Amino acid sequence: MMEFKVSPLTKIISLSGFLALGFLLVILSCALFHNYYPLFDILIFLLAPIPNTIFNAGNKYHTSDFMSDSSNTGQDLAHFLTGMLVTSGIALPVVFYHCQLIGHLSCIMCMIGGLIIYSSIVIFKWFFKKDFNEDDSLFG
């Protein structure tokens, strides 16, 4: 079976385009409707992956098994905070729409753009998390 490898430069270029699309949607949701409340959504989605990054930095070889008796409260707190921030990032435009601060198109564009921003950060961390024994070169 032929193995498909993608160079790291291609990964970075595609993720930067994906991230730019997310920022474009959120900024357009602000600029087209002359209301800059959705910019708070960018801040929330940029802060969302930070707890997982901080608390999972030292646990490279830890396996999470729901049947084991060992608990890791740091990771549980990180998952809770990340979930809270992602949920807040989705709910904030809905609250703004409910309070009639933004329109429904602005709400939809802001939520989709924020989710694209968060998912591009998570995919970036997933793409570039590799073992030391893994060779990522295309020609070797």
Swiss-Prot record:
InterPro entries: Vps55/LEPROT (IPR007262). Residues 33-37, 98-107 are lumenal. The keyword Transmembrane helix applies. GO terms for cellular component: endosome; late endosome; Vps55/Vps68 complex. Keywords: Endosome, Membrane, Phosphoprotein, Protein transport, Transmembrane, Transmembrane helix, Transport. Present with 2340 molecules/cell in log phase SD medium. This is Vacuolar protein sorting-associated protein 55. It comes from Saccharomyces cerevisiae (strain ATCC 204508 / S288c).
